[in-house]
Amino acid sequence: MIPIIVLIGRTNVGKSTLFNVLTKTRDALVANYPGITRDRQYGYCKLQSNKKIILIDTAGLDIKLNEIEKQAQAQTLIAIKEAHLILFLVNARDGLMPQEYEISKNIRKYQKKTILVINKIDGINEASKINEFYSLGFEKIQKISASHNQGINTLINRYLIPWISEKFKKKITENLYKDTELKKIAIKVAFIGRPNVGKSTLINGILKEERMITSNTPGTTLDSISTPIKYNYENYTLIDTAGASKKKKKINDFQRFSIIKTLQTIEKSNVILLIIDASLQTCHQDLSLADFIIHSGKGIVVVVNKCDLFNSVELKKIKELIKSKLKFLYFSKIHFISALYKKGIFQLFKSIKESYEDSKRKISTSTLIKTMHIAIKKHQPPIIKGRRIKLKYAHLGSSNPPKIIIHGNQVKYLSLPYKRYLINFFYKTLKIKGTPIQIQFKDNENPYVKNKN
C-alpha cells in the first residue's frame, strides 16, 4: 500500500503550489484567483530511500455557493476519506480565519493524522499572526513558504519520512517498483474539445463514478486531471482537460493557463480523443484542434457526443455532414456516442489501442522501398527542367508517429499534391489507422559538386 496524503484548506492558501513543489511537476494549475482547483488532482511524490507517496490536491473548503462549488467540496471529502494523512494548509498573511475553525472541526470527524502547515511565511514579521494558528489545537505544526521552497525539506524529513517509516515500513519500496512499471506501460489518453461537449461526462461514464465535476456551464473543468484505469488487461490514464474555447478579446490569466495546459497535455499524451458536440455545427475551433493534434503527431480518435438528442433520420444527416468536414482525418475512426446514457463509450478502447499500436509500429526498410516503388509505378513524379524527379529509397526515421524518410534527386521540387498522394498510398498499403504519418524528403548530394568548388 502506498501512503496517500491530502492537501486541505481554504481557497488560495497555496495547496496547488505545494502540490507542484512536492511532486516536482506543474500538474496543478496555480493562479491568484480563488476556486481554481475543482476536481481531485493526483500526483506522485518520491522521497529519500525509494519512499513514494500519492499526493492529492483538492478544492478549497470555504466556498459553498453554486452547484459546481458544491460538487468540488464533495470531491474534497472523498479525498479526505481516501487519505492516510492530512496536510491542513493555512495562510500566514491572512492570519487565522473563522472558516479554519470550522474546517479543523470537520477534519477531526475523520480521525486522520493531521499536520498543520502554515504557508506564505515569507515577509511576515509579526509573530502574533503566526502564533494565533496554535489555537486550532494541532500537535504537529510546520511553517513553510511553498512558492520560495522554504521549510519544505523540514516538512519532509521531520514529519513525512518518519510517519511513512513507522506506518508502512517495508511495503513502500516493493510498491514503488510495481507502480513505476504500471506507469510506464499506461496509454495516456487526452480528452480534448470545446467547452461543454461532454468530456468530463464521458470520463465519468467510463469510470462508472462521478470522478469529474460536470454541469451545463461551459468552462467547468479548468485544469488537466489524470485518472488511471484498467480495461481488458490494459492500463490507461484518462486525462480530462479544460475546453478550448473560441478566441475572446478578454480572458483571465487562469483561462489562458488552462488553454496552455490543454495544449501541453496533447504533447504529453499517446492518443487524443477529439470530442465534438453533435448538437452544434462543426466549427473552425474543432478543425483547428484537429490540425494541432495532427501536427503534434499524436494518434487521434474522433468522438461525436450527444447523439441521443436526434432521431435516426437527423443523425444520418449529421453523420454525413461531420464526415464531410473531417475528410482530412480519413485515417481516424469516428465514433457516434451518448456519454450521458453510456451508449457506444466502451467501443472507444478498441480504436484507442489500435491507434496507439500503429503509432509505435516498426516498419522494415524493404517494405517501405517496395511500397514506394509501387506508388511510383502507378503515378510517376513530375518532370522538372527536363529531368524527372527520382525517388530512390525510403526508410523509417522514427516511430510514434511513424516518420518515413524518402531519399532522391530534386525532391525539393515535389508538389504538395504528389506528396499527399504518397502519404495516402502509404496509409492504404500499410493499413495504418488512427495515427498521422509524417514524410520527410531528402535530396541526395552530389559528391563532385563540393570538389569543383
Curated annotation (Swiss-Prot):
Belongs to the TRAFAC class TrmE-Era-EngA-EngB-Septin-like GTPase superfamily. EngA (Der) GTPase family. CDD domains: EngA1, EngA2. The keyword Chloroplast does not apply. GTP 2 binds at residues 193-200, 240-244, 305-308. Associates with the 50S ribosomal subunit. GTP 1 binds at residues 9-16, 57-61, 119-122. Residues 361-445 form the KH-like domain. This is GTPase Der. It comes from Buchnera aphidicola subsp. Acyrthosiphon pisum (strain APS) (Acyrthosiphon pisum symbiotic bacterium).
